[in-house]
Amino acid sequence: MINDIISDSLTRIRNAGMRKLETTKLLHSKAVEALVGIFQAKGYIESFNVIEEDKKKFINVVLKYDEKGKSVINNLKRISKPGRRVYKGKDEIKRFKNGYGTIVVSTSHGVLANDEAYKAGVGGEILCTIW
């Protein structure tokens, strides 16, 4: 049984990128679907779709690579964990890696990227960073 589905999903994406796989399959949850949606909107993955196998839902993620065949995801790190939650205010999540990276934040408005959370004027739990 998996205790932290977000960490599991990030690890599956990271491992698939290192092995240069075209796709990877993640366990489905609303939080993971929102997280992958942000990754797609920011250009870190090609696409994703929800599939159902044996009455279980999965998210099929198509990874994105540059012209040299290297994954566009350089680093993917879980910040807030079940044993140690990390919360930040809107002013603390304004920029990350001089705008080249993204912080994914769980807010009262849903799961948002750092620039969207800043524009909405909300802070929240820092789920992960990606660049």
UniProtKB/Swiss-Prot annotation:
It comes from Campylobacter jejuni subsp. doylei (strain ATCC BAA-1458 / RM4099 / 269.97). Part of the 30S ribosomal subunit. Contacts proteins S5 and S12. This is Small ribosomal subunit protein uS8. NCBIfam families: PRK00136.1 (NF001109). Coiled coil: none annotated. Belongs to the universal ribosomal protein uS8 family. It comes from the Bacteria. One of the primary rRNA binding proteins, it binds directly to 16S rRNA central domain where it helps coordinate assembly of the platform of the 30S subunit. HAMAP family: Ribosomal_uS8_B (MF_01302_B). Keywords: Ribonucleoprotein, Ribosomal protein, RNA-binding, rRNA-binding. GO terms for cellular component: ribonucleoprotein complex; ribosome. GO terms for molecular function: rRNA binding; structural constituent of ribosome. Gene3D superfamilies: 3.30.1370.30, 3.30.1490.10. Disulfide bonds: none annotated. The gene is rpsH. GO terms for biological process: translation.
